[in-house]
UniProtKB/Swiss-Prot annotation:
Membrane association type: Single-pass membrane protein
Primary localisation category: membrane
Superkingdom classification of source: Eukaryota
Protein function: General regulator of phagocytosis. Required to uptake Gram negative bacterium by macrophages.
Cellular localization per UniProt: Membrane; Golgi apparatus; Mitochondrion
Organism: Homo sapiens (Human)
GO cellular component, one term: mitochondrion
Keywords: Golgi apparatus, Membrane, Mitochondrion, Transmembrane, Transmembrane helix
Entry domain remark: N-terminal region is required for phagocytosis of Gram negative bacterium.
Name used for this protein in its record: Protein C1orf43
GO biological process: in utero embryonic development; phagocytosis
Residues annotated as transmembrane: 11-31
Length: 253
């Protein structure tokens, strides 16, 4: 009986250790899965690395292109030409509730004005509003090449843009027409100055390409008579003999 009880106690110990190990493994797996779950939920990237098992060159190309995505910013056109909401502006009722449409039209007018504020690469075409404001501030600067543009015109555009995009005041039909008129005037002035500058550069390049006619150079050769040649040779020999005598006398002293 004593040996049987010892055997049963040994079996119980083994079973307890086995069940304890199993419970520990299950708890470890559960905790690990929960940690991975929360880590993936808080992670913004994909659950699997991009380009997994791909060649190194392809993986680098994928990473380079994905890194450019965060720099892509685009301002779409707010109102299309055939937008049904534009018909609401033609109604004779109370148009004050449709002033937001004039705000949208004011921002779209920057795109349709064709002002080349993105031509120098400093103001990309994708960010219309932000770079248009920077362009206006550059025009108002004294060091700008468009100093002839009136500052009052630029101030009108800046105020109209700020009111249409960020302002809380009234921006209705009158404000929009005033803003549109100033925008058209600026576009005309800038295009005229750019056209005159291009014509000036073309004329300067044309002047450089047209080189003046080069007159043929003439070489004049003078031949000495034979008597003068003999005299020059005789004088040279006399001078050489005098130099030799002088060197001999100097060495003897």
């Amino acid at each position: 009986m004593a040996s049987g009880s010892n055997w049963l106690s040994g079996v119980n110990v083994v079973l307890v250790m086995a069940y304890g190990s199993l419970v520990f493994v299950l708890l470890f797996i559960f905790v690990k899965r929960q940690i991975m779950r929360f880590a993936m939920k808080s992670r913004r990237g994909p659950h699997v690395p991009v380009g997994h098992n791909a060649p190194k060159d392809l993986k680098e190309e994928i990473d380079i292109r994905l890194s450019r995505v965060q720099d892509i910013k685009y301002e779409p056109q707010l109102l299309a030409d055939d937008d049904a909401r534009l018909l609401q502006l033609e109604t004779q009722g109370n148009q004050s509730c449709y002033n937001y449409l004039y705000r949208m039209k004011a921002l779209d007018a920057i795109r349709t004005s064709e002002i080349p504020f993105h031509s120098e690469g400093r103001h990309p075409r994708s960010l219309m509003g932000k770079n248009f404001r920077s362009y206006l501030l550059d025009l108002r600067n004294t060091s700008t090449p468009f100093k002839g543009v009136r500052k009052a015109l630029i101030d009108t555009l800046l105020d109209g843009y700020e009111t249409a995009r960020y302002g809380t005041g009234v921006f209705g039909q009158n404000e929009y027409l005033r803003y549109q008129e100033a925008l058209s005037e600026l576009a005309t002035a800038v295009k005229a100055r750019i056209g005159s500058s291009q014509r000036h550069h073309q004329s300067a390049a044309k002047d450089l390409t047209q080189s003046p006619e080069v007159s043929p150079t003439t070489i004049q050769v003078t031949y000495l008579p034979s008597s003068q040649k003999s005299k020059r040779a005789k004088h040279f020999l006399e001078l050489k003999s005098f130099k030799d005598n002088y060197n001999t006398l100097e060495s003897t002293l």
